[in-house]
Amino acid sequence: WQKLASSELASFKGIWAEQKQKLEGTEQFRRFNERLAREWAIETGILENLYELDRGVTQLLIEKGLDEALLDHGSTNKPTDYVIQLITDQRDALEGLFDFVAQRRPLSTSYLKELHHLLVRNQDYVDAIDTLGRHVRTPLVKGDWKRLPNNPSRPDGSTYVYCPPEHVASEMERLVEMHHAHVEATVPAEVSA
């Protein structure tokens, strides 16, 4: 793993720590972190295909805050109040993650389930395609491992096969064990990722 570590990132980490120390506690730093958290929350929902947002509206929400009034008619494909709820869930999950790290709690499968529950708090269904190729809505199980297969289709028509439901619990245990081994060996974050 040593070959994968980036010496450049280590120096950037030092620069960031120095700048953070200078700015911490200032209004500028607080606003920067708020905008960054909103951007992460909004982009997470877009990446997960929970909603679509126009780029201009995305920037407006990042800069001005999560206000339903900022969503024009036609700027999203879902009801505006629902989109704001989903974004708020993503932001709250991020805040919870920061608290988790600050408390130095060890990563566990129970925490991952807790995080999942928070991320999807206002999401009751997930859009899916059944074995016959039909678009369906299936109830979303919150805070637990998947119970049904989810193998997405690629643009070329092939299927990308994810871990089968019956193996998810053991694979997640294995992932947590790998993480703990990386922490113990002080593996750099960019390698662990």
Task: Place the predicted regions along the sequence by residue.
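FIC/Doc superfamily catalytic core
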Residues: 1-193
